[in-house]
UniProtKB/Swiss-Prot annotation:
Keyword Lipid biosynthesis recorded: no
Protein name stated in the entry: Meiosis expressed gene 1 protein homolog
GO BP, sorted A to Z: cell differentiation; spermatogenesis
PANTHER family named among the record's database cross-references: MEIOSIS EXPRESSED GENE 1 PROTEIN HOMOLOG, MEIOSIS-EXPRESSED GENE 1 PROTEIN
GO cellular component, one term: nucleus
Transmembrane domains' residue ranges: none
Family from the record: Belongs to the MEIG1 family.
Function: Essential for spermiogenesis.
Gene of this entry: meig1
Length: 88
């Protein structure tokens, strides 16, 4: 099984905000588990990111609608525990 076909072995909920949690939040609001699933579904090598922060800049949903994100944090504190962290 290649990395692009990997299925998660487990899932936990985020406890506190971090850069990783911010990016997971962005993927999940666009309808994907994480970057692994996004890259597999959309067949892309790179995800658009803000150079200053490294946060995801733009994602395309499965219905081809684009989501655009700001340079700054978008995952509010009350949303952190809704973010799912997958382990492969």
């Amino acid at each position: 099984m290649s990395a692009s076909e990997a299925k998660p072995k487990s899932m936990t909920r985020a406890k506190q905000w971090s850069d990783e949690i911010e990016n997971l939040y962005r993927f999940q609001t666009a309808g994907y588990r994480d970057e692994v699933e996004y890259r597999h579904v959309k067949q892309v090598e790179m995800v658009d990111r803000w150079p200053e922060t490294g946060f995801v800049k733009k994602l395309q949903r499965k219905d081809n609608t684009f989501y655009y994100y700001n340079k700054k944090r978008e995952c509010e504190e009350k949303e952190v525990n809704k973010v799912k962290v997958y382990a492969y």
